[in-house]
C-alpha cells in the first residue's frame, strides 16, 4: 500500500519558555519550518493565552503544522501532518525542535493511508525518543 500521509506527533520538553511563550516567534519558526520541509503555506493562526501558552496552526497545501505550548513547564505538543510526495515533514520537525531549544523529544510517526478500492485503513506507527544535545548551540 502506498502511504497517503506522514503524521508526526511530537512531545518536546526542556524547551525555552521565552520562545514557546511567544506567538509571533512561533509563527516565524513554523513558516520557516514549512519552507525547509518543502511545504506550501496557505494560512496561519496563532493565539496567545493569558497568562501564558500558545496554540497555533499553519495550514499548508500538504496538510498542517500545529502546536500547543506550556511555557511554565517548558513543554510543547507538536503535530506535523503531510501528504503527497514532495514534503519532508521530518525536516520541519527537526527545525522546530532546534528553534524551541528542546532538550528532549518523543516522536511518533504514523504512516496513514487507505487501501485502494478496499476502504481498509492502514496505520504504521514508528516511535522514538531522544535526548537532544544542544551544547554550544549545536545539535
UniProtKB/Swiss-Prot annotation:
It catalyses: S-adenosyl-L-methionine + H(+) = S-adenosyl 3-(methylsulfanyl)propylamine + CO2. The keyword Oxidoreductase does not apply. It is an enzyme of class 4 (lyase). Binds 1 pyruvoyl group covalently per subunit. GO terms for cellular component: cytosol. Gene3D superfamilies: 3.30.160.750, S-adenosylmethionine decarboxylase domain. Pathway: Amine and polyamine biosynthesis; S-adenosylmethioninamine biosynthesis; S-adenosylmethioninamine from S-adenosyl-L-methionine: step 1/1. Its EC number is 4.1.1.50. Is synthesized initially as an inactive proenzyme. Formation of the active enzyme involves a self-maturation process in which the active site pyruvoyl group is generated from an internal serine residue via an autocatalytic post-translational modification. Two non-identical subunits are generated from the proenzyme in this reaction, and the pyruvate is formed at the N-terminus of the alpha chain, which is derived from the carboxyl end of the proenzyme. InterPro entries: AdoMetDC_C, AdoMetDC_fam_prok, AdoMetDC_N, S-AdoMet_deCO2ase_core, S-AdoMet_deCOase_pro-enz. The active site is at 63 (schiff-base intermediate with substrate), 68 (proton acceptor), 83 (proton donor). Pfam families: AdoMet_dc (PF02675). GO terms for biological process: spermidine biosynthetic process. Its cofactor is pyruvate. Keywords: Autocatalytic cleavage, Decarboxylase, Lyase, Polyamine biosynthesis, Pyruvate, S-adenosyl-L-methionine, Schiff base, Spermidine biosynthesis, Zymogen. The record marks 62-63 as: Cleavage (non-hydrolytic). Heterotetramer of two alpha and two beta chains arranged as a dimer of alpha/beta heterodimers. PANTHER family: S-ADENOSYLMETHIONINE DECARBOXYLASE PROENZYME (PTHR33866:SF2). HAMAP family: AdoMetDC_1. Catalyzes the decarboxylation of S-adenosylmethionine to S-adenosylmethioninamine (dcAdoMet), the propylamine donor required for the synthesis of the polyamines spermine and spermidine from the diamine putrescine. This is S-adenosylmethionine decarboxylase proenzyme. The gene is speH.
Amino acid at each position: 500500500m502506498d502511504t497517503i500521509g506522514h503524521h508526526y506527533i511530537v512531545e518536546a520538553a526542556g524547551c525555552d519558555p521565552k520562545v514557546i511563550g511567544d506567538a509571533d516567534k512561533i509563527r516565524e519558526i513554523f513558516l520557516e519550518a514549512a519552507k525547509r520541509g518543502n511545504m506550501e503555506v496557505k494560512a496561519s493562526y496563532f493565539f496567545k493565552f493569558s497568562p501564558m501558552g500558545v496554540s497555533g496552526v499553519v495550514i499548508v497545501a500538504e496538510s498542517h503544522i500545529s502546536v500547543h505550548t506550556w511555557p511554565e513547564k517548558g513543554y510543547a505538543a507538536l503535530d506535523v501532518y503531510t501528504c503527497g510526495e514532495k514534503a519532508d515533514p521530518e525536516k520541519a520537525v527537526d527545525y522546530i525542535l532546534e528553534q524551541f531549544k528542546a532538550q528532549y523529544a518523543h516522536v511518533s510517526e504514523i504512516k496513514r493511508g487507505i487501501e485502494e478500492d478496499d476502504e481498509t485503513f492502514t496505520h504504521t506507527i514508528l516511535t522514538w525518543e531522544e535526548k537532544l544535545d544542544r551544547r554550544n548551540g549545536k545539535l
